[in-house]
Amino acid sequence: NVLAEAEIEEYIPKDFAIYDLPQFLNTVSLCSSPDIDVSSNESFAHIKEGTANRSKYFFSDPSVIIAPPDKEMALPSDDVQFMLGEEQLTKILKSSSILGLPDLSVVGEAGVVKLVVSDRKNDTSNDFAVVVGRTDKIFSFNFKIENIKLITGTYQVSISSKNLAKFYNTDYKLTYFIALEPDSSYEG
């Protein structure tokens, strides 16, 4: 559902698989200045901060991980584009948490592009919306909010009517490709 590409300065001496990336990142965040050692022939990473904190995080069997493609990812088409500011992203994620809403829709109607957090299976669902741009197109691109766990920042968002979206972080060399839900619609 989600593929991330990042260009980093650190050297990683070997390939390894992480089954639960959010859990791994949260483990790393337990240290304010972590030192992560994956250089040994062990089946785990040593995550430490001086002598005060230490964690052993086991790698996953690579056969249970869906590997990214060897070729560079690209959208089949760029049908809708908008900028998603850091504050807007924070409000969307916070409203989803506060209201207990599982869905995010990027909706084009009445000349505007808006992000709507709701429960699409419930006709009487509360919702929260943020306008992020203008459009002359009509569409509803749907995501599960659980797939929108992005590193904080401003994103240039491009969405293809072929049910794939690209979120490019303008602060880092970081791109997410996120699959849309199959009930998304685009009238152009």
Language-model-detected regions and their locations in the chain:
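DNA polymerase processivity clamps
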Residues: N1-F58, S77-G188
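Long, charge-dense
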Residues: P62-D79
